[in-house]
C-alpha cells in the first residue's frame, strides 16, 4: 500500500510539473524576462494606461520598428507561405494579434487557414 501511494504521489508531482511547463508565456512576460521595464511600453503613466484599451502602435515601434520593417523581418523563406505582417487589411494595430498581458490571437485565422505562431 505504501509503495502504491509513493508511486501515485510522484506520478502526480510529475504531472503537475509538466502542466506548469505548458503555461503560455505572454508578451509582457517575455519582455520582463529580457529586462524590458514596464515603463518602456506603458510610459510613466502606467496606472492610467492599464485602465485603457490601448490600440496604438507607438509602444511597439520604439523597439520593433514600423510596420513595413516588421513585414520585412517576418518574410518567410518559402514564398508559398504567408507573411502575417503583409496583409490586405492594411496596417492593423499590433494589439490585434499581440495582446501583451493576455494570450495572443491569430487574427488571420478568422477568415483564413494560416497556422501562424503568434508570440
Give residue ranges: language-model regions.
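Positively charged n-region of N-terminal signal peptides that target proteins for export
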Residues: 1-5
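Short sequence/structural segments immediately N-terminal
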Residues: 18-119
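Bacterial N-terminal signal peptides
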Residues: 7-15
Amino acid at each position: 500500500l505504501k509503495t502504491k501511494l509513493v508511486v501515485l504521489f510522484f506520478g502526480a508531482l510529475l504531472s503537475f510539473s509538466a502542466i506548469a511547463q505548458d503555461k503560455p508565456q505572454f508578451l509582457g512576460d517575455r519582455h520582463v524576462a529580457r529586462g524590458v521595464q514596464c515603463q518602456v511600453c506603458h510610459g510613466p503613466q502606467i496606472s492610467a494606461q492599464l485602465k485603457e484599451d490601448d490600440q496604438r502602435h507607438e509602444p511597439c515601434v520604439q523597439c520593433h520598428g514600423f510596420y513595413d520593417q516588421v513585414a520585412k523581418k517576418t518574410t518567410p523563406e518559402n514564398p508559398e507561405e504567408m507573411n502575417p505582417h503583409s496583409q490586405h487589411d492594411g496596417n492593423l494595430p499590433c494589439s490585434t494579434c499581440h495582446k501583451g498581458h493576455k494570450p495572443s490571437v491569430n487574427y488571420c485565422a478568422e477568415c483564413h487557414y494560416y497556422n501562424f505562431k503568434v508570440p
